[in-house]
């Protein structure tokens, strides 16, 4: 599959003409392979996914949207997935989801940045995706923590990995292992 964009300004009117032309050109070069692009806008604002064969979306319910509100993740994502599928009638892949976690921070009840919160966040996302038969794939963001430019929102890098930068597992890694074992 050709993935030709990640989080473009797909709510802008100019994006419609641009991506229509780009996808036509790609289909001339390779008519066999499906085309996709990854969106981060609301479905109501999207102007380009009709040109793709598969809809890909990055979603961070419980993190960038409704941070700390674990109970809103499942209903928010499920509603969002259904809207995308109803609008375009195409398979959907959730290409990014997750929450930052400080390795070793354990809190009950789970609070943002705790390992328990990351685990629950991933589980709530998985529950919503599992109930939508048109969801054909998912990708947790990210495999491992990584360094980014310093900023007030990023202390010592991106911490959304289910493994640390040193490749040590966080609590969520064990939950994912169990999820994948059940799929075999």
Sequence positions of predicted segments:
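Short intrinsically disordered, low-complexity coil segments enriched in acidic
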Residues: 1-7
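Substrate-binding clefts and catalytic carboxylate motifs of secreted carbohydrate-active enzymes
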Residues: 2, 16-28, 36, 44-184
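Short, small-residue-enriched loops and turns at beta-alpha junctions
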Residues: 7-11, 43-45
């Amino acid at each position: 599959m050709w993935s030709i964009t990640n989080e473009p300004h797909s709510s802008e009117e100019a994006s419609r003409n641009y991506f229509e032309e780009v996808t036509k050109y790609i289909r001339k070069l390779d008519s066999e392979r499906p085309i996709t692009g990854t969106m981060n806008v609301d479905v109501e604002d999207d102007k380009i996914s009709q040109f793709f064969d598969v809809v890909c979306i990055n979603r961070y319910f419980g993190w960038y949207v409704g941070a700390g509100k674990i109970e809103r993740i499942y209903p928010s994502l499920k509603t969002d997935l259904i809207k995308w599928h109803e609008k375009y009638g195409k398979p959907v892949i959730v290409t990014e989801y997750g929450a930052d976690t400080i390795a070793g921070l354990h809190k009950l009840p789970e609070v943002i940045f705790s390992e328990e919160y990351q685990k629950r966040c991933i589980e709530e996302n998985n529950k919503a995706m599992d109930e939508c038969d048109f969801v054909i794939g998912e990708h947790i963001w990210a495999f491992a923590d990584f360094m980014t430019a310093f900023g007030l929102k990023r202390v010592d890098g991106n911490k959304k990995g289910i493994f640390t930068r040193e490749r040590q597992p966080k609590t969520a890694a064990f939950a994912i292992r169990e999820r994948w074992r059940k799929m075999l």
